[in-house]
């Protein structure tokens, strides 16, 4: 498993290789049951019953992340704006003013890598502090996603 994270002025860019075919990694982003197993930073959960995904252009991509023992809830409301199975998913995320975030866009590319998947995520725009937090959050989520495929 390899990972590279870079930041431009306001965008986060992460590349990571997962030990599963891209069709399976792609599905993990659109199947609520699978999303509940990995989405969110380390210490967060995303309960299955709080996830709504409509895998089509304009479809909802929404979930609630619950933070640790404090049970603090963080709701994400997004729409699918590009969808090319199993190659590309782009979601536009509503603003979260209470977290100091405007509208962001998450672009996820899925590339075949000899039976594995090279995932390329571009996310933002973020101001510096939120971008650093988002990078840490994605790293934790991707660790959990990797464990889904490694049993």
Question: What does each model-found stretch correspond to?
Answer:
Residues 25, 35, 61, 80, ...:
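Hydrophobic pocket/interface hotspot
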């Amino acid at each position: 498993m390899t990972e590279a994270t870079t930041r431009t002025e306001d965008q986060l860019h992460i590349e990571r290789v997962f030990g599963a075919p891209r069709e399976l990694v792609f599905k993990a982003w659109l199947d609520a049951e699978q999303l509940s197993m990995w989405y969110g930073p380390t210490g967060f959960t995303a309960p299955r019953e709080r996830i709504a995904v409509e895998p089509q252009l304009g479809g909802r991509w929404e979930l609630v992340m619950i933070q640790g023992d404090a049970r603090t809830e963080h709701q994400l409301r997004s729409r699918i704006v590009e969808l090319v199975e199993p190659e590309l998913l782009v979601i536009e995320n509503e603003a979260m003013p209470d977290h100091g975030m405007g509208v962001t866009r998450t672009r996820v590319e899925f590339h075949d890598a000899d039976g594995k998947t090279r995932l390329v995520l571009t996310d933002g725009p973020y101001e510096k502090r939120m971008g650093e937090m988002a990078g840490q959050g994605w790293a934790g989520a991707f660790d959990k996603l990797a464990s889904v495929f490694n049993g």
